[in-house]
Amino acid sequence: MEILSAEFVVSNTKVEKCPQDNLPEYAFIGRSNVGKSSLINMLAKRPKLAMTSSTPGKTLLINHFLINKEWYLVDLPGYGYASRGKKQVEKIQQIIEDYILEREQMTNLFVLIDCRLEPQKIDLEFMEWLGENGVPFSIIFTKADKLTNGKVKDNVNKYLKKLTEQWEELPPHFVSSSEKKTGRQEILDYIDSINRSLKA
């Protein structure tokens, strides 16, 4: 699949205010500073589609982008911002949970993981929560350009091994670099395969 058009549609904090046209939605989420906005811009080939910032946690809304007039790419608020007050953290968490659990159009959730880091408790707990709630998700390991290919492979394998402690069957996973465009086609082809299966 190639992206021919990508346009911003709406930002909000309420699931009921999301688009009502029943197109499939692919949501992206991750911890602070995982490279989510850069990944979204890389996938869409639009450098400024999603707002990037050196300040973690700028995405505080559910952002819908219409892709090829066929499906939505959804940029969700991130989780795990230690610098935020308790009330704001709880508010963001509620926005995330409401969308993930109530949005029937969400076809797949991409969980972004910084491949440079050891498995983080907050990510593992979040994925466990997704599993408990039957949420279909995939993993995208980001920032692969920051390490050698061998180190990326080692870190990803270590992460997947950690997941096997909780999971009998591992979710699909991808390795990406927004700088080098690594993983772009694989992720888009995966989305395309799901879209095709929905039409079958």
Curated annotation (Swiss-Prot):
The keyword Iron-sulfur is assigned to this record: no
What are the top taxonomic ranks of the organism?
Bacteria, Pseudomonadati, Bacteroidota, Bacteroidia, Bacteroidales
Keyword flag Cell cycle: yes
Keywords on record: Cell cycle, Cell division, GTP-binding, Magnesium, Metal-binding, Nucleotide-binding, Septation
Q: Which residues cross the membrane?
A: none
Membership in a protein family: Belongs to the TRAFAC class TrmE-Era-EngA-EngB-Septin-like GTPase superfamily. EngB GTPase family.
Q: Give all residue intervals belonging to the EngB-type G domain.
A: 22-197
Q: What is this protein called?
A: Probable GTP-binding protein EngB
Q: Which domain of life is it from?
A: Bacteria
Any GO molecular function:
metal ion binding
What cofactors are annotated for this protein? Mg(2+)
Q: Where does Mg(2+) bind?
A: 37, 59
* InterPro entries reported for this sequence: G_ENGB_dom, GTP-bd, GTP-bd_ribosome_bio_YsxC, P-loop_NTPase
| Stated role | Necessary for normal cell division and for the maintenance of normal septation.
Please list the residues that bind GTP: 30-37, 57-61, 75-78, 142-145, 173-178
An example GO biological process term is: division septum assembly
- UniProt-listed Gene3D superfamilies: P-loop containing nucleotide triphosphate hydrolases (3.40.50.300)
